[in-house]
UniProtKB/Swiss-Prot annotation:
It comes from Azobacteroides pseudotrichonymphae genomovar. CFP2. This is Uracil-DNA glycosylase. It catalyses: Hydrolyzes single-stranded DNA or mismatched double-stranded DNA and polynucleotides, releasing free uracil. Excises uracil residues from the DNA which can arise as a result of misincorporation of dUMP residues by DNA polymerase or due to deamination of cytosine. Its EC number is 3.2.2.27. PROSITE patterns: U_DNA_GLYCOSYLASE. GO terms for cellular component: cytoplasm.
Amino acid sequence: MNVKIEQSWRKYLVPEFEKPYFKQLVEFIKNEYASKIIYPKGNKIFSAFDKTPLDRVKVVILGQDPYHEPGQANGLCFSVNEGIPLPPSLQNIYKEVKDDIGIVSSTSGNLERWSEQGVLLLNATLTVQAHKAGSHQKKGWEKFTDAIIHIILKEKQHIVFILWGTYAQKKGAFIPSDKHLILKSAHPSPFSANKGFFGSKPFSKTNDYLKKTGQTVITW
C-alpha cells in the first residue's frame, strides 16, 4: 500500500501498512474525508513524522486526538496553525515553559519549531470529525501509533517520553523506564493543570536528561 510518509519512517512502517487493520483504517479515513469535514487537512495527517524524522527523535510528547474546531489541527499534538488563538491547554503549556525555564513562548501556537528539533508531537489518533472530539478513536489509529512507539523503542536510545494525563500514561505504560526518561504529570487542560501539571518542570527535566546523555537540548 502506497502511503505518503517521511522516508526514514516508511522503511520501518511498510509491514504495518500491509496489515488488515491498517487497510481498513485507510478505507474508513478515505470515506470520512469524502463525506464529512475532517481535521487536519489530508496532507497534514502525517505531519508529525514529516517534521521529525526517526533519526532525529529525542523527545516524544503523547497527545490524544487532533483539535476538532476549524483551522486548528495541523498534525502535531497540542499545536495549532499560525494565526489561530492559543487553545487553553497550549496556553498552560506555555505558562509552564515560562515558569520552568524562564522562556516567554512565541505568540504563535504552531509547534513546528519543537518538531524540527527532534520533539515528536504524536497524537494517539491522527484524525477527527469536525466538532466531534474522539470521533475517530478505536478505528485503528491507536494500533498504528503504538507501532510508532515500538519502532522508537527498538531503534533509539535515551528518549524522553512526556505523558500528560491518564490517557497518555495508559498508552505509554509499556515503555521501559530503565532505558528512557518517562515524565508523567496531570494534563495541561484547565480541568487538571492545577492538579500536578503546573510545577512539574518537564522542559528543564527533559533538557537535563538530554545533556546527561550527550544530546543537544531543546530550545523550547
